[in-house]
Amino acid sequence: MPEHLNARVEACYRQAEHFFQRSFPRPTVSFRLRGQKAGVAHLDENLLRFNPQLYRENREHFLEQTVAHEVAHLIAHQLFGPRIRPHGEEWQLIMRGIYGLPPDRCHTYAVKRRATTRYLYRCHCPEHNDFPFSPQRHTLVAKGRRYYCRRCKATLVFTGEVLRE
């Protein structure tokens, strides 16, 4: 997987170097990005992070558009400095003029939502209201934190039910 992506990063840099007649330091490339973002450029660290799941599901467009998009951020930063807008004129110039690509801000890849886990807690109100807790909040309860019902002021108690959505 990384070979094609690294080759595309290198190709984008060579195009920029040919156009601007100067060399640019190569970034570190990481595949440790999750969630909805396809890629992120860390300007001061000269680092590119890519989402491996979105790459696998959208390989052709990802290599063409997303890699160029993120490389353009680093090139624009190195050419014009830190005070430019992320998707401003300078970045758009690189996307259109060098890579011949539309300067799209966001991808349109289908992103699968991660399964969520909720732990049901209940109070002693007559209605027996359920309170779904996140795993983080459930862990805090296990460590001694208490949460209270706003109506009856009783401590919320874990019912033993776990919901997976």
UniProtKB/Swiss-Prot annotation:
Main location: cytoplasm
Binding, Zn(2+): H69, H73
Active site: E70
Subcellular location field: Cytoplasm
Cellular component GO terms, alphabetical: cytoplasm
Cofactor needs: Zn(2+)
KW Zinc (keyword) present: yes
Cofactor notes: Binds 1 zinc ion.
PROSITE patterns on file: ZINC_PROTEASE
GO biological process, one term: response to stress
Keywords: Cytoplasm, Metal-binding, Zinc
Family: Belongs to the SprT family.
The protein's name in its UniProt record: Protein SprT
Species this chain originates from: Pseudomonas aeruginosa (strain ATCC 15692 / DSM 22644 / CIP 104116 / JCM 14847 / LMG 12228 / 1C / PRS 101 / PAO1)
